[in-house]
């Protein structure tokens, strides 16, 4: 299960990602928001983080205007490792090296095709453990 949420600036891209994921046979938990009226992004970040924290979702996606606000909000939640990704390589590395459990993207800065490439890269990657494990453990225990 993939939890996904956005603020008003990420509504369109969130829906496009949901459609893409469902097309690929993925189960999606859509946590809003559902309109382009201005909302506060931290509440949507928290909703996605809770799903990941309690195991109801394997990982999550958050979308706001730039991805920065959602990344900051998500990383305040215990056990969450949210990575703002800008291309397929950063999405892959977020999983392989940092064991990210949430990726954040910018609805105003990322086109549809690039968003799909980033999601696909993250989904196809696995944590590499090894030298990365103590680093991730240090983040988790901070």
Where are these regions (language model features)?
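Short helix-loop-beta junction
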Residues: 20-27
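N-terminal beta1-alpha1 ligand-phosphate binding loop
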Residues: 1-17
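Short, structured active-site "lid" loops
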Residues: 44-62, 66
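A short beta-strand-loop structural module common to alpha/beta enzyme folds
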Residues: 27-38
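Short active-site oxyanion
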Residues: 1-2, 56-60, 79-81
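Short hydrophobic/aromatic-enriched beta-strand-loop microsegments
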Residues: 27, 80-87
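C-terminal binding/interaction regions
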Residues: 5, 9, 88-142
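Short Gly/Thr/Asp-enriched flexible loops that form oxyanion-binding sites at enzyme active sites
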Residues: 69-80, 89
């Amino acid at each position: 299960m993939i939890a996904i949420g956005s603020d008003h600036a990420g509504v369109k891209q969130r829906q496009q990602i949901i459609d893409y994921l469902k097309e690929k046979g993925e189960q999606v938990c859509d946590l809003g928001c559902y309109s382009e009226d201005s909302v506060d992004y931290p509440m949507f970040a928290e909703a996605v983080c809770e799903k990941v924290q309690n195991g109801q979702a394997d990982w999550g996606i958050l979308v706001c205007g730039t991805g920065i606000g959602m990344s900051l909000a998500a990383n305040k939640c215990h056990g969450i490792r949210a990575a703002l990704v800008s291309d397929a390589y950063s999405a892959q590395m977020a999983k392989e090296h940092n064991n990210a459990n949430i990726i954040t993207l910018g609805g105003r800065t990322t086109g549809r095709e690039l968003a799909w490439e980033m999601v696909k890269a993250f989904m196809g990657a696995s944590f590499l453990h090894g030298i990365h494990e103590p680093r991730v453990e240090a983040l988790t225990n901070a």
